[in-house]
């Protein structure tokens, strides 16, 4: 497993991350398939969108279908018929999202099973075991994603627990002789001192890549990108930087300018299910009445299946009003492709040293305003 930075434009980078199941060109956007499926579409349709890697969730796959079923198929790739790389969240996000159903200890986390209500116990070692059997190309350490806002004292204690869990994850990952990649997750809330503490200790332990966690949980964009900028300056240049859970198009561009290489988010698929379709000229809210008789495709120059087969805005509006599953599928295909086209254009702009021009054109079209004057980074 190798990561190489191939070109830079300011702090933005184009890189190549080589995994067992394929090569990922970065910056890369990762569609979310929490339960081993990107909602509404097939694995082939995800691949046709240009996606290079999928994110799935360790915790939920452990509960359903369970490891025994996945072992029958050998790994998660064969289970979901996706032959590209897979990254799996360790279960740490569920420490945040299921906060009313869990109890944190230094040993691990007790959860109430959201399916049947039974008590289950997840530890760093167990998370590494599960991800090993899933066959994840990129494994994430077990951590706590802290809610926002939280006190300095709470986050400081959480960082220490997560550092302990990261070290245990590293030791058990190595004990399994897992030949895939192990990424650490830098926590610390909105406090630079705690982010620095987390990052420096994780760098000392040594990991294949570093994720920036604990963001997009309610903080302002200004706070978010202040932390992203700060942490990217600490992560070693030769390691991939992964910003978790952030995915608005303008946020991706800003983070790329700050030096981020990878992203995941549910926005393209969730918004598709709610009739929000992304284009180079802004968002089309397909359920609006003005599209009832609109014969145009979602976007004239889009090369996705939905636009190329000329499914009209009028038809998609009708499907949305009728709550037809075909509409969700066609919307999702378009949004997934939009995100991959955006990343392709970003990578090409970096290669040509024209990222500033690309960003200025994007901001003009979207009437988008920088939160931190990030153009100074390119």
UniProtKB/Swiss-Prot annotation:
Coiled coil: none annotated. Its cofactor is Zn(2+). Residues 245-251, 269-273 are annotated as: RNA binding. Binds 1 zinc ion per subunit. Transmembrane segments: none annotated. Keywords: Glycosyltransferase, Metal-binding, Queuosine biosynthesis, Transferase, tRNA processing, Zinc. Zn(2+) binds at residues 302, 304, 307, 334. The active site is at residues 89, 264. Pfam families: TGT. GO terms for molecular function: metal ion binding; tRNA-guanosine(34) queuine transglycosylase activity. Its EC number is 2.4.2.29. It is an enzyme of class 2 (transferase). It catalyses: 7-aminomethyl-7-carbaguanine + guanosine(34) in tRNA = 7-aminomethyl-7-carbaguanosine(34) in tRNA + guanine. Substrate binds at residues 89-93, 143, 187, 214. Belongs to the queuine tRNA-ribosyltransferase family. Homodimer. Within each dimer, one monomer is responsible for RNA recognition and catalysis, while the other monomer binds to the replacement base PreQ1. Catalyzes the base-exchange of a guanine (G) residue with the queuine precursor 7-aminomethyl-7-deazaguanine (PreQ1) at position 34 (anticodon wobble position) in tRNAs with GU(N) anticodons (tRNA-Asp, -Asn, -His and -Tyr). Catalysis occurs through a double-displacement mechanism. The nucleophile active site attacks the C1' of nucleotide 34 to detach the guanine base from the RNA, forming a covalent enzyme-RNA intermediate. The proton acceptor active site deprotonates the incoming PreQ1, allowing a nucleophilic attack on the C1' of the ribose to form the product. This is Queuine tRNA-ribosyltransferase.
């Amino acid at each position: 497993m190798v990561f190489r930075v191939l070109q830079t434009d300011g702090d933005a980078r184009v890189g190549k991350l080589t995994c067992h199941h394929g090569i990922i060109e970065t910056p890369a956007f990762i569609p979310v398939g929490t339960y081993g499926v990107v909602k509404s579409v097939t694995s082939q349709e995800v691949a046709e969108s240009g996606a290079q890697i999928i994110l799935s969730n360790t915790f939920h796959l452990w509960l359903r279908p369970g490891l025994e079923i996945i072992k029958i198929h050998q790994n998660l790739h064969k289970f979901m018929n996706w032959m590209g790389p897979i990254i799996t969240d360790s279960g740490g996000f569920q420490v945040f999202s299921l906060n009313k159903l869990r109890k944190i200890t230094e040993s691990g986390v007790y959860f109430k099973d959201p399916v049947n209500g039974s008590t289950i116990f997840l530890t760093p070692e167990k998370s590494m075991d599960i991800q090993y059997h899933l066959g994840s190309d990129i494994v994430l350490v077990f951590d706590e994603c802290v809610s926002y806002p939280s006190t300095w004292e709470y986050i400081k204690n959480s960082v220490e627990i997560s550092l302990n869990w990261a070290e245990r994850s590293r030791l058990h990952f190595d004990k399994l002789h897992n030949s895939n990649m192990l990424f650490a997750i830098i926590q610390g809330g909105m406090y630079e001192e705690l982010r620095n503490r987390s990052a420096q200790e994780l760098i000392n332990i040594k990991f294949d890549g570093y994720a920036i966690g604990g963001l997009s949980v309610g903080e302002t964009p200004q706070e978010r990108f202040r932390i992203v900028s700060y942490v990217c300056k600490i992560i070693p240049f030769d390691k991939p930087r992964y910003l978790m859970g952030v995915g608005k198009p303008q946020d991706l561009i800003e983070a790329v300018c700050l030096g981020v290489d990878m992203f995941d988010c549910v926005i393209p698929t969730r918004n598709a299910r709610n009739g929000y379709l992304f284009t180079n000229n802004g968002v089309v809210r397909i359920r609006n009445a003005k599209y009832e008789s609109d014969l145009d495709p979602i976007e004239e120059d889009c090369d996705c299946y939905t636009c190329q087969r000329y499914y009209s805005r009028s038809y998609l509006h009708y499907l949305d009003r009728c709550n037809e599953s075909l509409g969700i599928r066609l919307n999702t295909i378009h949004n997934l492709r939009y995100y991959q086209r955006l990343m392709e254009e970003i990578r090409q702009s970096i290669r040509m040293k024209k990222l500033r021009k690309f960003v200025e054109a994007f901001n003009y079209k979207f009437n988008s305003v920088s939160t931190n004057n990030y153009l100074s980074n390119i």
